[in-house]
Amino acid sequence: PQDTAIVVNPNDPASPRGSDYLYDISVVSEVKLSISHDDWNTFLTNFDLNPDNNTYIPATFSFKKGSESFQIDSVGVRLRGNTSRRRPEGATGELHQSQNANWHHVHFQVKFDEYRDKVKFCNSDRVVLKWFKDDAMYCREVYSYDLFRRFGVWTAPRASYTRVSIDIKGDSKPAYFGVYALVEGVSEAFLANRKAAGKLTSKNGNLWKASWGATLSPNSMSDDKMGVSVTSLNPSESVNYVYDLKTNKKTGLNAARTQLNDFVNTMNGLASGSSALKTFLETRMDVDQFLRAYAVNVMVGMWDDYWHGQNNYYFYFDENNKFYFIPFDYDNTLGTSIGMNAGTQNMLTWGSLDNDRVLMRKVMSITEYKERYKNYIKELASADNDYFYTDKSLARIQQWHTMISPYLANDTGAEMMLNAVPAGWGNISVYCVLRGKVTG
């Protein structure tokens, strides 16, 4: 059928659809980023100056789902990732080649309001386009975020499948980058959507991104570890913090630091297992969301997390000082691990329970919480529920494979087929999605 361009309002052409439409896991949408020749060359040159830079370039964002199509001009596009970052085309110093370009899979972030205020798409202010690095089964991150949602973890981002094309204006045709994960960005709009759904009471609190070393322990709370990260084109001008404040950045840093210190130090000072600690946790954090999130976390074998890896999560304090844990970055799961055996690790001692992980140590010291966590693991594993149980999980993954398989071949020449092998750097090679041994 002929495409139907739908425009509802200039700030969000798909606002009536909402996030359920954008992160619909039952279909493969299409995303095209149209970028001028000069801006793409700037993108490549910026990478050469500093591969870690977060500098945006302008683009036109096009989204197609079924017979509906949408377009937003003047969005911002940048690279994402840590160890996964690389040049999207060619080698160092090379500019764009209109013929026989050497394309590379990369992660992109699209920010709809980078150049124009209040612009959104399906109520989101940004989306992350992630290639399936080290996941030849094209399922790990999508599966994990879907499982969070099924199990009621509304603090987790959402994800779906999409087909990504990069259209360098003037080229004979767009470059097809293949199937990507379309992941919800954790941002102000992320908070606003959850407030609108009645999950949060406020959207204007302090949102933090936690990176390696973020133990949520007093010894990680110094001011030189809490700040607003800046990643510029000049590496010497860049500064990164373990705890990176993402909201209220202009005037609220000192208050946010005080709030975080107060939460950690007060919790740390209360006796483990005590009624005073339980009262504090009940009033100052969403304990149930945390327990549900961690039951899913260990079931999918996420080792590069808060508990084991002191890494890869967000957290949010609402305007009533209540703490919410936000799981994040679940591509290294389902058997892809290092530093632990994710298939046999004790789920009650997934990571440290000493002074290096005060939050986990304190929560697990409350018998009621530990038992609830254990019961959640049982719920996830039960054959009666459509959660983690083997047959139920495999059916979902196989359905997704049927859906995406026709679209895997792409112009990078890489990751062109499904292959049941874990990441080459992983420590347990027998853990393979859809096949493999039970233990490593």
Which positions does each model-derived feature cover?
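Middle-to-C-terminal accessory/interaction subdomains
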Residues: 20-22, 26-28, 39, 99, ...
